[in-house]
Amino acid sequence: ERGYWRDVGSIDSYWQANMDLLDYNPELNLYCMDWPLRTYNYNLPPAKFIWEENDRVGMATNSMVSEGCIISGGSLSRCILSPQVRINSFSNVTDSILMENVNVGRYCEIRKAIIDKNVDIPPYTKIGINPDEDRKRGFLVSAGGVTVVPKGAIL
């Protein structure tokens, strides 16, 4: 097994390095038993996916979901969730990184975003859909189109 190094000095390179972890056979394989991963354990319950109704299904595809997360009738695709993130019903999150303690209200649409810690996203919020609107709300939008919501932001 050879070593791994990646420049993550910009928003776009940080986002891409994280998205690369979701590939079927990533260059940095977090599941390689020959190269153990040492990390802090939060001692939280496992992630939970709930609701299975017609248009209200808690699900995630091609994503990494940490302990303590609840996907309650919302859906994720190509996302990385830190501990204690909640995705509420009818919300869709794609190509995004959500840090610890983020709550996504109902009917939200989030695309290609990095949401920092302790952010409560109200119902019907759209992030990463319209860069001009995101900038008006004080969010950074990178050259590559990644929207960053700062830690503790009030939306």
Question: Residue locations for each model-derived region?
Answer:
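Left-handed beta-helix
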Residues: E1-L155
